[in-house]
């Protein structure tokens, strides 16, 4: 779905680095290195990025909207 503003577990704001993460991921960088560079250190916050679906630069939300 839409990327959350805050981590579900600890409540830290994570959405402010999402666009850079997405851009760098699309350029073929390693997700672990991107999160390290963006200083996303907590496991719960890293999980939010790792579990968010991006397929060919399309989010799950883009697929669901087609069926409204």
Swiss-Prot record:
UniProt entry tagged with the keyword Zinc: yes
Matching Pfam families: RNA_pol_N
Broad enzyme group: transferase
Cellular location(s): Cytoplasm
EC number: 2.7.7.6
GO molecular function, one term: zinc ion binding
GO BP term, example: DNA-templated transcription
Manner of cofactor binding, per the entry note: Binds 1 zinc ion.
Domain of life: Archaea
Transcription is among the record's keywords: yes
Reactions mediated catalytically: RNA(n) + a ribonucleoside 5'-triphosphate = RNA(n+1) + diphosphate
InterPro entries: RNA_pol_su_RPB10, RNA_pol_suN_Zn-BS, RPABC5/Rpb10
GO CC annotations, alphabetized: cytoplasm; DNA-directed RNA polymerase complex
Cofactor(s), names only, from the UniProt record: Zn(2+)
Binding site for Zn(2+): 7, 10, 44-45
Key words, A-Z: Cytoplasm, DNA-directed RNA polymerase, Metal-binding, Nucleotidyltransferase, Transcription, Transferase, Zinc
Main localization, broad class: cytoplasm
HAMAP family reported for this sequence: RNApol_arch_Rpo10
Protein family (similarity comment): Belongs to the archaeal Rpo10/eukaryotic RPB10 RNA polymerase subunit family.
Task of the protein: DNA-dependent RNA polymerase (RNAP) catalyzes the transcription of DNA into RNA using the four ribonucleoside triphosphates as substrates.
Subunit structure: Part of the RNA polymerase complex.
Protein name: DNA-directed RNA polymerase subunit Rpo10
Organism, as annotated: Methanococcus maripaludis (strain C5 / ATCC BAA-1333)
Gene giving rise to this polypeptide: rpo10
């Amino acid at each position: 779905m839409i990327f959350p503003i805050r981590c579900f577990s600890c409540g830290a704001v994570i959405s402010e680095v999402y666009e850079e993460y997405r851009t760098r991921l699309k350029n073929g960088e390693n997700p672990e290195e991107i999160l390290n560079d963006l200083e996303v250190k907590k496991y719960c916050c890293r999980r939010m990025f790792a579990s968010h679906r991006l397929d060919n630069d399309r989010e799950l939300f883009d697929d669901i909207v087609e069926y409204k």
